Regions:
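C-terminal motif of bacterial Sec signal peptides marking the signal peptidase cleavage site
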Residues: 27-29
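Feature for extracytoplasmic/surface-facing segments of secreted or surface-associated proteins
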Residues: 36-224
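Non-catalytic accessory segments of hydrolases
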Residues: 221-376, 584-594, 601-602, 607-608, ...
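Substrate-access "cap/lid" subdomains that shape
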Residues: 290-293, 387-390, 394, 428, ...
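Alpha/beta-hydrolase active-site loop
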Residues: 302, 374-397, 453
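Alpha/beta-hydrolase fold nucleophile elbow
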Residues: 317, 400-411
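Short glycine-enriched nucleophile-adjacent loop
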Residues: 415-427
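C-terminal subdomain of alpha/beta-hydrolase-fold enzymes, centered on the catalytic histidine
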Residues: 484-486, 490-684
């Protein structure tokens, strides 16, 4: 990490920083060992008293450069005039005008270049673009070696890392193809793991970053930049489109690890200096196979959010997104959920939130209830969402958002989290509108005793003698032990002091304008909610409620009779046709003829079918057409209009009646919205 910045894993910057961002000192002048064709520039020396040599005296006027693409602390460099040094605690290197700088990690040479405050891989070593393997492989190595795994506070190369890299230098060849280079790092990473050289909170062995992830991080870090001052400190985001700024990996709470596991979230530690906001933070700890569906790593250190805002934003409505996956899975760290060309393009500020999941976020236990101070336990993931909303209230104005006009929305498990927040007194005043997409509400909330039984079952499966021992186990063991358990929200005498039924029927819930969305071929629980629970909610609410049946499905699948599946609306709301690939891989796209997963052949002739996971085949099979493009525009307009006004009616598109049990009115969202009657009869 960079000194002066916390390690919890606006205004436009000046031209000098933007110029530096166009370059990096991930130098391409030479390869490493194992096939490198260029030689390392030797260190300049002068005779030392008593014999031997030492670096040339630093009697030149020193200039300063900072590595773009992520400041690197502890990187070795030598100047032909100034001698040998390491980049300092802010990732800076110093040089004299006219000298040559050579960089290395211990004995592993990285390259050399004429000294300047901005060193570019495109101007050193003949690279054509940042996709040149010599550039990409250096990016992969440096980002992989970051000691604490948090690229938002820079890359830290410690002495231990430097020494072990030196011992493996001969095996590192920067001229290899990306896949081969990544594989070649396995022995080095195994040695670093064995030595305990990494300090991040993921107990799993460190793996090399992919070439795509490394290039994307470099692109974000070298884009135009923007500063925002928050209650925690100053953030530096990046230009995510010509009209938007984006800020990734913003901490809204302390890492819930060690003694903070299974406790209410704690306010984050502030930082001094500037914290970068260009790297995805970790996804919440969960089944490891699901990591591929999101960006960033995976660990308990996951209490971060992302903000996307128009460049000229001023007091715009705010939309806060909660991801699906029940209470156990998935992440908000996806490109579709943070698409700058989606909802934000319609005049809102969007926030996406990650929070604790599964047994780490939603179990209770008698010992936890005894220590909590409110006579209950559980709902830690929901408490995270409350703290994220508190962060939004305190900080979103700095990004151009209106803290008094906040809409929470989510799909599937995210919709369920929205409904839970509507029932919680802890969330009072933190949001002003709500959208539940395929969410489920069970009015008779799980009791504390029932939830504590799940916690006791987890303890037994862990073979732990005490709560202290449970807290000491790696998250990977906790997730594995909870594989057959079903943790979710419960009455806890704190976040939920009473059942959701009591909350609504006593009218103590957060009574805000509400829109419920269900898909034509949705799963049973959301259908049950829209048929039987939604009318009950409306009867106990003063605010207007609206209902939508989403029926649009991509053209290619529409032609095969596929009905809109669970999560099917997300491709439209987030202007992300590519998201149907994830939906398909999660077995959500159903063949009406068989009731099973839709079969997709080898449409591009590469020998791998869509059914076997070829993403190009899946997207081609979906076949988005002009009707889908229209549905995308309509969906974004409707969702953002509701966020702006509390009414989804859009002039010239749809005059949306509020739902009541008496009128039974809803809107079907196909290629064009149509007002209909008979929500209660849509599903048999």
């Amino acid at each position: 990490m960079i000194r002066g910045m916390a390690s919890p894993k606006g205004r436009r910057c000046g031209k000098r920083w933007v110029a530096a961002c166009a370059a990096t000192a991930f130098l391409l002048g030479c390869g490493g060992g194992g096939g490198s064709s260029a030689s390392f520039v030797g260190w300049p020396t002068v005779p030392a008293p008593g014999g031997g040599h030492e670096p040339a005296p630093d009697n030149q006027a020193r200039l300063t450069g900072v590595f773009a693409g992520g400041p690197v602390v502890g990187l070795d460099y030598r100047g032909s005039v100034t001698g040998a040094r390491k980049t300092d605690a802010q990732g800076r290197y110093h040089y004299a005008a006219g000298e040559t700088l050579s960089f290395s990690i211990g004995e592993l040479p990285l390259g050399a270049a004429p000294a300047a405050d901005a060193l570019s891989p495109l101007s050193i070593g003949g690279a054509i673009s940042s996709a040149d393997p010599r550039a990409t492989n250096r990016l992969v190595l440096l980002q992989t070696l970051d000691a604490d795994g948090d690229l938002n506070n820079g890359i830290q190369v410690t002495g231990a890392i430097r020494d072990i890299v030196s011992r493996h230098a001969a095996a590192i060849d920067f001229t290899q193809a990306a896949t081969a280079f990544r594989a070649s790092l396995a022995p080095l990473l195994a040695a670093l793991d064995a030595a305990g050289a990494f300090t991040d909170l993921d107990p799993r062995p460190r793996s090399a970053r992919s070439a795509v992830a490394a290039q994307e991080h470099y692109t974000r870090a070298t884009a135009a930049r923007n500063l925002v001052i928050t209650t925690g400190g100053t953030l530096r985001g990046f230009e995510s489109s010509a009209t938007t700024w984006q800020y990734l990996g913003i901490p809204y709470a302390q890492p819930p690890v060690g003694a903070l596991r299974w406790r209410a979230p704690q306010a984050p530690q502030p930082w001094s200096g500037v914290r970068e906001a260009v790297a995805w933070a970790d996804q919440a700890a969960q089944v490891q196979a699901l990591e591929r569906f999101g960006e960033g790593g995976m660990s308990e250190d996951s209490l971060y959010l992302n903000v996307t805002a128009p460049k000229l934003a001023s007091k715009l409505p705010v939309m806060v997104w909660f991801h699906g996956g029940g209470f156990t899975s998935l992440t908000s760290n996806t490109k579709p959920f943070n698409n700058p060309n989606a909802l934000v393009s319609k005049g809102v500020v969007q926030v996406s939130v990650n929070h604790r999941l599964g047994a780490l976020g939603y179990i209770a236990h008698p010992a936890l209830s005894a220590e909590s101070g409110h006579g209950g336990s559980g709902n830690y993931g929901q408490m995270d969402l409350v703290m994220a909303l508190q962060w939004v209230k305190a900080n979103i104005a700095a990004f151009g958002g209106d803290p008094d006009n906040v809409t929470v929305f989510g799909e599937s498990g995210g919709g369920r989290k929205v409904l839970s927040l509507m029932a919680s007194p802890s969330a009072a005043g933190l949001f002003h509108k709500a959208i539940s997409q395929s969410g489920t509400l069970i009015p008779d909330t799980r009791t504390l005793a029932s939830a504590e039984a799940v916690g006791l079952a987890l303890q037994k499966r862990l073979g732990a003698a005490s709560l202290e021992e449970m807290r000491s186990r790696p998250w990977t063991e906790v997730v594995a032990a909870a594989s057959v358990l079903v943790p979710y929200t419960n009455i806890d005498n704190g976040y939920l002091p009473y059942s959701e039924r009591v909350s609504f029927e006593s009218r103590r819930h957060n009574d805000v304008p509400f829109m419920i969305v269900v898909n034509t071929n949705d799963t049973p629980d959301p259908i049950e909610t829209v048929k039987n629970v939604f009318p009950w909610m409306t009867a106990h609410s003063a605010s207007r409620h609206y209902a939508a049946l989403f029926s649009q499905v991509p053209g290619g699948w529409r032609a095969r009779g596929v009905k809109t599946y669970h999560a099917g609306e997300l491709a439209y709301v987030f202007n992300a046709p590519e998201s149907v690939v994830t939906h398909y891989l999660l077995d959500l796209v159903i063949d009406p003829a068989t009731g099973g997963k839709l079969a997709i052949g080898d449409l591009n002739g590469n020998g791998v079918s869509g059914s076997a996971g070829d993403t190009q085949d899946i997207l081609a099979s979906a076949g988005f057409d002009s009707a889908d493009a229209k549905a995308i525009e309509n969906s974004m307009a409707i969702w953002t209009q509701f966020a702006k006004t509390g009414n989804p009616s859009v002039a010239g598109l749809v005059d949306w009646p509020a739902y009541t049990p008496a009128n039974d009115r809803f809107v079907e969202l196909g290629a064009a919205p149509v007002v209909r009657t008979g929500l209660s009869s849509v599903f048999p």
